[in-house]
Structures are given as C-alpha cells and as structure tokens.
Amino acid sequence: MQTLKEKSTQLCVYHEDKKVVDLWASQDDSFSPDSLINVFSSGKSLETIALASLVGQGLMNYTDKITDFWPEFGHKGKQDLTVAELMRHEAGLAAFDGSLDTQDLLTENIKKNKVGKIIEEHVQKYRPNGGSRREYHAVTRGWIVNEVFRRIEPAGRTIGEYLREDIGTPLGVDAIVGVKQEELSRRALVVPLGFKFVFWDSLKPRFLGRRMEFNFFQLTTKILRMIPVIRNSTTWGTPAPFKGMRGIRFFNEPSLAMGETPSANTHSNARSLAKIAAMMSSGGKFNDQEFLNEAAWTALHSEPVKATMGMGRSIFTQGGVAHFTPCNADSSKLDKAFNTGREGFYGWMGLGGSIFQWHPTHRIGFGYVPTSLNLVDILNERGKTYQAEVLNCIERLTK
C-alpha cells in the first residue's frame, strides 16, 4: 500500500468466519475502514446473491426463460434467453443504443419500469466476427437482473432494497446499491490514475521507486493484446451508459450514486465485502445465521461453463460468478494473469482495482477496495498480489 500509487485503500480477509486481516491506509484523515467506495463490478457478485435467494425459495431456476417472469422482455427476438445465459454474460445485451438518465435509476423510477421499457425494446447483438457469444456486460447485466429480480421477489423489492434489508442489516455490513442522501458524506471518491502518470512511471525501474505494478513493456504488451478484443465487440462505438457522462469521474456524481446500477455502481468497503465473502465461503451461513440455503448456494456455484470473453477464457457458473482455476503449460498469458494467484476463488472484481471473492475450500473471504483506479490493470493484478499471499499463508498453516 505504501509502495504503489495509492490515495486511499482497504484490505480485509476472513478465514473460517474470523477476521484475520484488517488494513487500511490513506494520505489524509478523511478516510476510514468504514468509508463507502464505489466497487464497480465487484457488485456483480452481490447481484448474484440476490438472484440466488429466489432460487432458494423455489421461485425460479437458472434454466428458466426470462420471459417466464417478464413476458415483455421477449420483444425483438429475445424470447428464448435463459436466466443462466444472462448471468454468464451471453445475453447479447452488452451495451445499449442510448444513454440512461440517472433519475430513471432511482428505486422508485425503476419500479415504474423506466429502465425495463428500454430493455424490452432492445435487440440482441453479438460479436460481428462470430465466435463465443460470451461478451462482458459491464454495466447492463445488473439493470436486466434487477428487472428480473423485482418481478419475482414476493414483495416486489429491487436488488438495492434486498441487499439493505436481507444482507446489510442482519450481517452488519454496507452492501449499498442506491446511496441515500444521508450516506453521501461517507463516500470516499474514486480517482483514476492519469494515463500520463501511468506511462511515465512505468518507465522507471522498481529500485528507483516505480509506483506501478508493471513496467512499460509489460503495460504495452497488455494494451496491445486488448486492442483487437475491443474492436471486435458490440460495445465499440456505443454511447456512454449514462447521460452526461464524460469520463470515469462521473461515477462520483451524487445523482448516479443514488440510483441502482448493481453491476457497476455498488458502494461498500473491504470490511463489508470480506464479511459477505466469508458468509459465502461457509455455504451461505455466518455465525449460525443463514443468508442462502443449501439449494441456493449450490445452484449459484453449479454448471460452470468455460468460454472466451475477450480478456481470455473465463469460467462462469449458471449463477453468474466466475471460478478461478489452476493454469497449465498451454495456458495463455492472459489466462495466467486472470487465474494464477486466485486458484479456487469464486466471485469477481471491479474496474480499477476492487476485488470481492471467496474460497469455499479454505473458507476465505477476501475484500480489497482502493480509491485510486488503475484503468490499465484490467485483470486487477494489483489486488491479486494480496490474494496470492493469503493462499500462501493458508498453505503454510495447513502443512
């Protein structure tokens, strides 16, 4: 934390329901381990927990068609799409043709179907050059899942309401999709690292105080690998997801923070993510409290399918969490960057650095949340360094 370019950062780890690591650091006193930070796509794993709770109640299965619960979704040829395909990023809805108004994302407006109407009239699009149908739904998956969730949930709640009432309050954590007015002051705003800084700092050798994880040549190689992937995507050239968005700092806007974008705009902290992850690593239970029953937990982690998603090959379960597995001699460099150091973990990570993952075999709950966003570190290898060290510690403990 002291050697890399960090403004404020948090790291928390649970092992067998016990908090064993609780670190945070900042350049000023305005930051604390309980500060709220946008964890971006780490929120995707929270939306999977919400949906799994419906499976546990016998209200849906992942093999069901979305139109079983939301008939209007079938417009424009989407009638056969299953919940599992949506959760595995295979819905063909990775980006929308228009930008959404942040006011439409407020909980009360979601319940008026402001977002649902847009999704209903949207057509599916898959990569122009064919191949795998899996394409990362960076922002859109959460909007669609929220519409499915609220139509099935007995009280008609949104994901944001479920997380507050069924996860946040009983577990004593912050799992916030839709920040309330009185919570805005708790936020620590995200700060993207400028590309100029990234470029010049990467030219330094480590012994001269380089504050980036990778040197210039490593960064250049990673960027060059991603260019053809980006160009062969359905998101290339599409509008920004939000009206008025001019860059990543737009995520600091209160109007956006107060709306529900579960896949890209969840506010939490490392302590909370690690505790939720500890619950998930223990089969959906924490200190005798059950948050997901066995049927829900098992279904969420079942039916893993490997496919190319642009950033190398990924394994996603039917419930929508990634499973990180050991690599072999034939694995690509991207596959190794994605998996090595995370073997056995489930979950996901967020733009610029955050990680929210759990390891059922070793019963590890892991949460890492920085405010300094390294947008070039696409696979969150900065935080993976801590994950690898946690695995090393567990290995030494079990010898």
Tell where the protein language model's regions lie, with residue ranges.
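Short, charged, amphipathic alpha-helices and their helix-cap/turn boundaries
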Residues: 18, 23, 103-129, 157-174, ...
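Short, well-structured active-site flanking segments
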Residues: 20, 34, 46, 53-71, ...
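Non-transmembrane alpha-helical segments in soluble domains
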Residues: 52, 67, 84-88, 116, ...
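Active-site-proximal alpha-helical segments within enzyme catalytic domains
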Residues: 89, 141-148, 264-286, 354-371
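Active-site Gly/Thr loop motif
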Residues: 193-270, 298, 302-361
